[in-house]
């Protein structure tokens, strides 16, 4: 039995991937709820800031986590360095989201509301990355 890591792509256990997906959704929804309270109370963001409404944030969270879980599974199957590529994808997602936040500022949205939304995005990307790479790690199959 070989103890060397294979450079070949691996796979993810489906149950662990579903567990990572569930943990991500619960953690992000809870953090979004907490950050919504902070955004409204501490930063005095307006109540009509649509990103803070659960009927908007929860479906978007589900879509983002499902997309990330799919990407994680595909990267594990086709890439020899899935965690690195997943990290790069998370960085691009956050950067593009911040650029889109500038559009929200251009429509005269509350600056502190947009900052709170940006914090939500960073927390969400971090939770997804850690859940996928720690709960559903890559299993490498080596041939002897």
Positions of PLM-derived features:
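Membrane-helix boundary connector in multi-pass membrane proteins
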Residues: 99-116
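Aromatic-anchored segments of alpha-helical transmembrane domains
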Residues: 29-30, 92-103
């Amino acid at each position: 039995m070989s103890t060397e890591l294979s450079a070949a792509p691996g796979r993810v256990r489906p149950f662990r991937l579903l567990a990572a997906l569930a943990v991500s959704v619960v953690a992000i929804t809870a953090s979004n709820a907490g950050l919504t309270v902070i955004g409204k109370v501490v930063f005095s963001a307006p109540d009509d800031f649509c990103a803070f409404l659960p009927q908007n944030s929860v479906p978007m969270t589900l879509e983002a986590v499902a997309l990330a879980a799919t990407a994680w599974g595909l990267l594990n199957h086709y890439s020899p360095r899935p965690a690195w590529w997943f990290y790069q994808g998370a960085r691009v997602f956050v950067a593009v989201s911040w650029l889109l936040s500038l559009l929200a500022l251009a429509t005269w949205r509350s600056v502190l509301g947009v900052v709170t939304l940006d914090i939500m995005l960073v927390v969400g990307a971090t939770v997804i990355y850690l859940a996928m790479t720690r709960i559903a790690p890559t299993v490498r199959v080596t041939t002897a």
